[in-house]
Amino acid sequence: MNNIFLVHTEYHLLTTFRVIFDKYKDDNNFIYIASEHRIQGEIKSSLPNVHTRRLPHINYGVYSTLKEFEILNPKNIFFFQYNSSDNIYLSYHLNKLNVNVALVQDGLKPYPIWHRRFLLLNCLKETFEFYKQMFRRWAVIPTLFIKSYKYGKLRFINQLWVDYPNKLPYIPNKKEIIPIPLLNDDVVIEVSRIFKFKPSVPLNNIILYIGQP
């Protein structure tokens, strides 16, 4: 079975390995890195069935990328950035080919409840911007959807992978909610080797603060 992961940041890569090591260690996993500065150099996994490839950091949601993905005949596609028209274009068309589309938590985006003024107007403006971006790339979705601030609401998303399923303010209809596997020693060793840091952290008499880079 083949799986595709679309990643942009170190956090995405870390979470991808959490999913792979727990659920898909015996499958063929293709990690596509769309990052200009965040993830540099060669990314090579210790698992022989994990393959990394590069994409442009923007404007990769085009027909040629879609065809490349189709050749892989994936069972699942995982992506993190819900506000990316590139990801939405690719996910929509792969879902039409019966590929399972999984949106994976990126930060705390799944959990807020939005009470913005003129919420509908903002949704319409962002929907227009989405379609404008796609048309500029000659990338077409032959249906109209209205962008929503409700996380993962788009109907062609099949699964939501989140750290805290019980904290979701709502569950979109017909979505399967899956907890992201916990970080384990195998994943720590894997990412420490990839990013070249020591897997152990001194904890005596220090305060460890971890924030988003």
Predicted regions and their residues:
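Active-site and donor-binding regions of nucleotide-sugar-utilizing enzymes
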Residues: 5-150, 163
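N-terminal beta-strand-loop-alpha-helix module at the start
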Residues: 1-24, 30, 183-198, 204-213
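A nucleotide-sugar donor-handling region in carbohydrate enzymes
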Residues: 125-208
